[in-house]
Amino acid sequence: MVAHNPKRLTWTLAACALIACSSGESAKAGAGDRDSSGSGGGDRTLVVFNAGSLALPLRAALDSFAAREGVTVQQENAGSLETARKLTELGKIPDLVAVADYEVIPLLLIPEHATWYAKFAHNRMVLAYGDRSRGAAEINTGNWWQVVTRPGVQVGRADPSLDPNGYRTLLVWQLAERFYKQPGLAQRMLASAPARNVRPKEADLVGMLQAGEFDYIWSYESIAQGTGLKYVTLPEEIDLSSASDSAAYAVASTRIAGKTPRDSVTMRGQPIVYAFTVPTRAPHAALAAKFAAYLASGDGRRVLRGAKLDVLERYLVVGSGAPPSL
């Protein structure tokens, strides 16, 4: 199926502005590079590092939490791998880390920087496009792979070394090749999305698609919905959304950098699951625990859902040392 633009244009424009400012530094609720919400002194500042695809949902949750608690909040958006490496390589320690692939936390942060994580949301890979995109009038769930591999079609994708969306894109291509029984399809998709079309994170691609620089971008359904983009849904066998297809997803794999530049690890296809943690050296651990509890509360989940995130009914905590409220 093909999803169309939502009616709430004002909300969509605000969402696009926030996505556009997701530069890997701090984000405002609408524009700019740094944000503070709520009131209170510096000792009541909650700092959150999160995946670019969580920019909108966590912005909404942070604003709600700040209003309730009378605290200041700061948000930094980047690819999940880049987010984790802010701790491991730059020594920047936030109060809470939220990533688009739960595996990033045990892979890069445990045990040195964290001891637990909470799985809290799902997503699915989609192919987003605009009215001016080549093939926009005819693309659908059945023919998308033929449209994006046509000569001249330009496809944007995220950097697999910085963002899970980037390596998930490569996995989707492999799964599509098997699903459609088209040998060489993954390589043809790569030709339509060469290195010059790679950006640090999937959120960076939205503005370029809207400006007509790309015909299509690989994204998440939550981002496409949150920014009002049209998109093509993919079969569950390849969109990394279905728990029942876990074994089939796992046949696809790619390698990315590990804890050090010299290390590499294999990432296999699996259902998309988001997670968050409070670092062991979080400057405001008690406040972070309170925010984590808010994210898991009924009110917190409603706010996240309102920002188009598919949150779990019950969060799954892995590891030890998590706040009792989770």
Protein language model regions, located:
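Bacterial N-terminal signal peptides that target proteins for export
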Residues: V2-W11
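Bacterial N-terminal signal peptides
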Residues: T10-A20
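Exported/periplasmic ABC-transporter solute-binding proteins
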Residues: S22-L90, D101, L109-I110, D131-L326
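Short acidic-hydrophobic sequence patches enriched in Asp/Glu that either
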Residues: V47, K119-F120
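Short beta-strand-centered segments that line the small-molecule binding cleft or hinge
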Residues: P94-D101, I105-K119
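Short, solvent-exposed loop/turn segments at the edges of secondary structure
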Residues: H122-N123, P271
